[in-house]
């Protein structure tokens, strides 16, 4: 595949994975309270489950309980109570394991619509409803003994980028779980000519890290129709803290995608390979009707001088990392993947949309977990962000972002010519 084809595919991915939103009027979000307590939206025990949601502009908040992750009506609706700093909470005193739930927020006398919440960590098929699970049941055998492969210096890293489906989908790969997380757990696979495939191929290459294209729950693939041809790179985020269901053997069972993702990480670690996630916090697949906008309208996105959604991502919106709770969301999310899934590094898509302070705060938080967890990203944006240039995590501000790597597009352009101009050579 040549570079021109890659650019075309990228444009198709953006077109199918991102949608624009409608006009929105700015409001003084600096007056919103900042919640500093434990940010967990679902805490399960066999005796009770506590639900929490940060929704500071809400008049009322309800949690709706369902028997299934898709279809049917809620069998129970529970009113939540305001707690502190914009948080709403309720405790349901019964064993809810295996049930599903959504939140609905009332603002200006209008119910905004169901969401799985801001911080959902387990969901049903297509990620429309969050799930009540027992987290101990998501750990594969040996998970507590899993260790990161050693890394002395970031300069020793050799990174191989892969897309879950593309890497293992070929019918001659000898892989049983083609196109799935589990493909990277299978050893001894090869083509009919004896060429190594899957994880054995990665080992023979001698790479130290694999960079996984978006592996969180994204919008563009219908998980109920996996027998149909569907494809996207995954740059259309829906639920940031949940593995993508189309790469699991059963997207209907919430525990399966979590367990299988962990199995993949553990297998790569045993092979001496660290795991980097491609993370896309700079935009969401949809704005109006999405989880952020239905929960705290306007807060998580920037607007332009006309009050319309800003669009430095080229995908219809750009998130407002400089706002305290969006900043905290990003920090909590990255650290969650590092702790719960033992992720070893993060590649930030369009990092130049984010502010310097937030990126440094993420680096500081990861250092407390393990300073060998790497961070790097694209030090640019697809358009002009609605934040002063001096505050942005752009490539020219690399000196203000210690221990955060950046891609160098000058090296690319010197080899193949300027991006977007195939008529001009290097």
Predicted regions mapped to residue ranges:
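C-terminal motif of bacterial Sec signal peptides marking the signal peptidase cleavage site
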Residues: 16-17
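Sec-dependent signal peptide recognition
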Residues: 2-9
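Active-site-proximal helices and loops of the catalytic beta/alpha 8
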Residues: 72-82, 87, 228, 234-235, ...
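The feature marks proteins involved in alpha-glucan
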Residues: 22-46, 82-188
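Structural beta-strand segments of beta-rich domains
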Residues: 47-51
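Short proline/glycine-enriched turn/loop motifs at strand-loop junctions of beta-rich domains
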Residues: 54-61, 96
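Substrate-binding/active-site clefts of carbohydrate-active enzymes
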Residues: 165-341, 358-370, 374, 420
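Core domains of carbohydrate- and sulfate-ester-processing enzymes
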Residues: 99-151, 220-236, 242, 289-308, ...
């Amino acid at each position: 595949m040549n570079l021109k084809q890659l650019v075309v595919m990228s444009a198709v991915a953006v077109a199918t994975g991102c949608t624009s939103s409608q006009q929105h009027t700015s409001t003084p979000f600096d007056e919103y309270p900042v919640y500093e307590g434990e940010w967990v939206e679902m805490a399960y025990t066999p005796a009770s489950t506590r639900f929490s949601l940060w929704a500071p502009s809400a008049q009322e908040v309800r949690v709706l309980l369902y028997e299934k992750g898709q279809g049917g009506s809620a069998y129970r609706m529970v009113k939540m109570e305001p707690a502190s700093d914009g948080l709403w909470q309720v405790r349901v005193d019964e064993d809810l394991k295996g049930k599903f739930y959504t939140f609905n927020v009332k603002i200006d006398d209008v119910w905004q619509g169901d969401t799985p919440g801001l911080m959902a960590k387990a969901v049903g098929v297509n990620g429309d409803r969050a799930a009540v699970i027992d987290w101990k049941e998501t750990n594969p055998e040996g998970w507590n003994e899993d260790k990161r492969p050693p890394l002395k210096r970031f300069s020793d890293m050799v990174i191989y980028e892969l897309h879950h489906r593309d890497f293992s989908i070929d019918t001659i790969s000898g892989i049983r779980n083609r196109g799935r997380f589990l493909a990277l757990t299978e050893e001894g696979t090869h083509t009919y000519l004896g060429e190594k495939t899957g994880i054995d191929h990665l080992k023979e290459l001698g790479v130290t890290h694999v960079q996984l294209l978006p592996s969180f729950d994204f919008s563009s693939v219908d998980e109920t129709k996996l027998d149909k041809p569907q494809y996207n790179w995954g740059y259309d985020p829906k639920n940031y803290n949940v593995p993508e269901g189309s790469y699991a053997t059963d997207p209907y069972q919430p525990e399966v995608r979590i367990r299988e993702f962990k199995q993949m990480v553990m297998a790569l670690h045993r092979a001496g390979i660290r795991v980097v996630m491609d993370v896309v916090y700079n935009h969401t697949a949809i704005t109006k009707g999405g989880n952020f906008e239905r929960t705290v309208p306007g807060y998580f996105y920037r607007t332009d001088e006309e009050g319309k959604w800003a669009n430095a991502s080229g995908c219809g919106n750009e998130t407002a990392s400089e706002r305290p709770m969006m900043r905290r969301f990003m920090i909590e999310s990255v650290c969650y993947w590092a702790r719960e899934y033992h992720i070893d590094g993060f590649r930030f898509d369009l990092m130049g949309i984010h502010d310097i302070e937030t990126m440094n705060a993420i680096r500081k938080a990861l250092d407390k977990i393990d300073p060998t967890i790497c961070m790097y990203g694209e030090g640019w944006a697809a358009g002009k962000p609605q934040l002063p240039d001096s505050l942005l995590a752009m490539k020219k501000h690399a000196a203000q972002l210690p221990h955060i790597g950046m891609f160098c597009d000058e090296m690319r352009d010197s080899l193949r010519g300027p991006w977007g101009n195939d008529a001009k050579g290097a």
